[in-house]
């Protein structure tokens, strides 16, 4: 019987999840809360804050949803999956205890240390003075300072000198830029090498990695400017060879799942591994307890299997018997952002070039809505820092990148900002073999 599904969140990632779920024959009525303007073309939207666990769970119970996909990190960390389970509604995503793998950097670093999972050397602190004493004593730059808790993907500072480190410590620990997330910090060594994002499905027993991807975090071309939630992605990541994939499975993926089980908090859902391929081998930079944004916008378009079946298998512990297959092709996503993002930007700018939220007549192009709204007169307008993600799929990455940019040119709004070099590093790596 077709399932009535609720997706919790309201960005490009959630839009990509909804579009993939809708391909499943078991997917019936689909809702998104809070959703956004562009998502409302694909799902019914209900304006409930993703972090309002009580209201969301009451809504899910009242509407009798068969399955809930909790796609955003904050509600997972707040225990939304536990609260849904308490009223008998199955959900995709880790419970509160397992979500700590992302919600607390201290927890995840200590987990890796205890179970021998390769990661950067680190120390944890709750006293700002001691942080600076340690950094001065080490005398090694750049140094990485991370807020312990969730910080919208912006709680990681790479400091080139003592002054930057002191400013960073003040910002996180004293000025409380990220609130209680900055009560503790992790200080770690700066690693070098290509970065790889690997999202994986897990039921707490087996891990089935998705196709690898490459994110572009900085706001401007040539990886300059401020860190953002991500300005574009490509998949697969050419640096992630079959040999490296096998090494990661043996030394990182399975050991992480076993470690969580040993700690009494088995992880079910999407576990995202942020990896760096260092001269000493792959190391974990970060874990996320959910799909990445905008990685999801290139990974799920390449999924050939039934996403709803895979998700329910993760929830039910039957992933070993469930097919997870990706196409051999490639995908590229270019983010169209509001000028001034990630600092100050205006909202409410009319968007032109789209029909019902999509580019008309483009077979292999999908527009995912991150921050859009529909006004009372039906105009699609900007409503966030990252506005749209334009994804192209093609047999080869070169074509995917070219087509994503060609499609992006057809969309416009005032003060639109995009990077012009998404995928160039990956294409260079392919060219160099």
Feature annotation, model-predicted:
Residues 46-52, 123-127, 159:
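Short acidic-hydrophobic, aromatic-tinged amphipathic segments that line or gate anion-handling sites
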Residues 1-96:
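ATP-binding N-terminal substructure of ATP-dependent carboxylate-amine bond-forming enzymes
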Residues 92-155:
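A conserved helix-loop-beta module that forms one wall/lid of the active-site cleft
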Residues 249-271, 288-362, 375:
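Active-site "cap" helix and flanking loop/linker of ATP-utilizing ligase/carboxylase catalytic domains
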Residues 372-376, 381-433:
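Generic C-terminus detector
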């Amino acid at each position: 019987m077709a399932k009535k599904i609720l997706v919790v969140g309201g960005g490009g990632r959630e839009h990509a999840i909804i579009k993939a779920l809708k391909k499943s024959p078991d997917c019936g009525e689909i809702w998104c809360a809070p959703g956004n303007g562009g998502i409302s073309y694909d799902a019914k939207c209900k304006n409930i804050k993703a972090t309002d666990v009580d209201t969301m769970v009451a809504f899910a119970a009242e509407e009798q949803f068969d399955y809930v996909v909790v796609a955003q990190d904050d509600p997972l960390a707040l225990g939304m999956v536990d609260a849904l389970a308490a009223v008998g509604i199955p959900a995709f995503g880790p419970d509160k205890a397992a979500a700590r793998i992302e919600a607390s950097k201290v927890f995840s670093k200590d987990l890796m240390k205890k179970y021998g999972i390769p990661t950067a050397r680190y120390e944890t602190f709750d006293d700002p003075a001691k942080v600076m004493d340690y950094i001065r004593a080490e005398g090694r730059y750049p140094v990485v300072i991370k807020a312990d808790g969730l910080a919208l993907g912006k709680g990681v500072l790479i400091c080139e000198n003592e002054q930057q480190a002191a400013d960073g410590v003040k910002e996180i620990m004293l000025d409380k830029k990220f609130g209680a997330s900055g009560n503790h910090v992790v200080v770690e060594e700066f690693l070098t090498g290509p970065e790889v994002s690997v999202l994986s499905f897990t039921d707490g027993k087996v891990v089935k990695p998705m196709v690898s991807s490459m994110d572009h975090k900085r706001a401007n071309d040539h990886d300059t400017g401020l860190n953002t939630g991500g300005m574009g992605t490509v998949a697969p990541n050419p640096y992630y060879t079959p040999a490296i994939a096998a090494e990661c499975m043996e030394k990182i993926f399975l050991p992480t799942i076993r470690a969580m089980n040993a700690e009494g908090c088995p992880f079910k859902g999407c576990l995202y591994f942020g990896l760096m391929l260092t001269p000493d081998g792959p190391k974990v930079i970060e874990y996320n307890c959910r799909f990445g944004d905008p990685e999801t916008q290139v990974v799920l378009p390449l999924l050939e299997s039934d996403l709803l079946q895979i998700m329910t298998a993760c929830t039910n512990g039957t992933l070993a018997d469930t097919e997870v297959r990706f196409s051999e092709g490639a995908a590229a996503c270019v983010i169209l952002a509001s000028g001034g993002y990630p600092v100050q930007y205006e909202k409410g700018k009319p968007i032109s070039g789209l029909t019902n939220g999509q580019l008309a007549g483009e077979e292999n192009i999908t527009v995912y809505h991150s921050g859009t709204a529909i006004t009372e007169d039906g105009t699609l307008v900007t409503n966030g820092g990252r506005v749209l993600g334009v994804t192209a799929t093609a047999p080869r990455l070169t074509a995917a990148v070219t087509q994503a940019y060609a499609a992006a040119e057809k969309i416009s709004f005032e003060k639109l900002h995009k990077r012009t070099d998404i995928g160039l590093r990956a294409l260079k790596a392919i060219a160099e073999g």
